[in-house]
Swiss-Prot record:
Belongs to the Mrp/NBP35 ATP-binding proteins family. NUBP2/CFD1 subfamily. It comes from Chaetomium globosum (strain ATCC 6205 / CBS 148.51 / DSM 1962 / NBRC 6347 / NRRL 1970). Heterotetramer of 2 NBP35 and 2 CFD1 chains. It is found in: Cytoplasm. GO terms for molecular function: 4 iron, 4 sulfur cluster binding; ATP binding; ATP hydrolysis activity; ATP-dependent FeS chaperone activity; metal ion binding. This is Cytosolic Fe-S cluster assembly factor CFD1. Keywords: 4Fe-4S, ATP-binding, Cytoplasm, Iron, Iron-sulfur, Metal-binding, Nucleotide-binding. One of its GO terms (biological process) is iron-sulfur cluster assembly. ATP binds at residues 15-22. The gene is CFD1.
Length: 303
């Protein structure tokens, strides 16, 4: 099984679409890499694979090896800066054209998920993050059954569940938490995404979708609340254009001044180069927020 070299497997789940699972997966991967861990991301959102675009590698094509695939490298490990390697696998790399629709029935989706879990040749990984579609569909059932049957119990660390603050979102995400209970998947915690909006001019954070719904839900299910993540337009600029985030002078997040933290390894290179994403993300206002979330997950998984 291709998961034999993986230490910890973390699922990123949500019962609601559009809550930012792929964004959370991307930032968890970057934060883990910044902490020196080797990371893989497996995108099993078969009908809407967005992970390739998040990392700026949507034009990449996987290499076919005897019996499987070699994942795409986002960046290699850099011992001089303490950065860990990051690799990605997605159905998006296998489509003939980027805009092609995937119109598959349940059995074919199930077979594809199982193939992804068995036929991708990962190097030694500290963490494999699995980005999933919304809901509790065939992909989720196949994923849970395969992991529970074939992965070692110590490998399957658990799930990070993503929601937004509104009741219309948490109502569906509660079903995902029930799914985890029924399938025996441990919940590592709940992330409340899109909890506030960071003004690009003054960096003040305003609640536009309410706030606190994710924390209330976590308490109701007696699971850890990992934190709130606001919407930051500068993160979108980074993902879409490759330009480093920039903020007004004196902008501080969690006591860290990020207004001058724009140095990247490329010495100011503002091209959309996936190899530089992990360095540029350090200057994003969301990085100091994801840092403690990532640390909590690591502490929970490795205790």
């Amino acid at each position: 099984m291709s998961l034999s070299k993986v230490k910890h497997i973390v699922l990123v789940l949500s019962g609601k679409g559009g809550v930012g699972k792929s964004s959370v997966t991307t930032q968890l991967a970057l934060s883990l890499s910044q902490a020196g861990h080797s990371v893989g991301v497996l995108d099993v959102d078969l009908t809407g694979p967005s992970i390739p675009r998040m990392f700026g590698i949507e034009d990449a094509k996987v290499t076919q090896a005897p019996g499987g695939w070699l994942p795409i490298t986002v960046h290699e490990a850099d011992p001089s800066t303490g950065i860990g390697s990051l690799r990605v696998m997605s159905l998006g790399f296998l489509l003939p054209r980027r805009g092609d629709a995937v119109v598959w029935r349940g059995p074919k989706k199930t077979a594809m998920v199982r193939q992804f879990l068995s036929d991708v040749f990962w190097d030694e990984l500290d963490y494999l993050l699995i980005d999933t579609p919304p809901g509790t569909s065939d992909e989720h059932i196949s994923l849970a059954e395969t992991l529970l049957q074939k992965a070692h119990p110590e490998q399957l660390a658990g799930a990070v569940v993503v929601t937004t603050p509104q009741a219309v979102a948490t109502a569906d995400v509660r079903k995902e938490l029930n799914f985890c209970t029924k399938t025996g998947i441990r919940v590592l915690g709940v992330v409340e995404n899109m909890s506030g909006f960071v003004c690009p001019n003054c960096s003040e954070c305003t609640n536009i979708f309410m706030s606190g719904g994710g924390e209330v839900m976590a308490k109701d299910f007696n699971v850890r609340f990992l934190g709130r993540i606001p919407i930051d337009p500068q993160f979108l600029v980074l993902i879409e254009t490759g330009k480093s985030p920039r903020y007004p002078e004196g902008t501080s997040v969690n006591g860290q001044d990020i207004s001058s933290a724009t140095q990247v390894a490329a010495n100011g290179d503002e091209t959309r180069d996936s190899r530089l994403l992990v360095y540029k993300y350090k200057s994003c206002s969301l990085a100091p927020i994801f840092g403690p979330i990532t640390a909590d997950i690591i502490a929970d998984v490795t205790r």
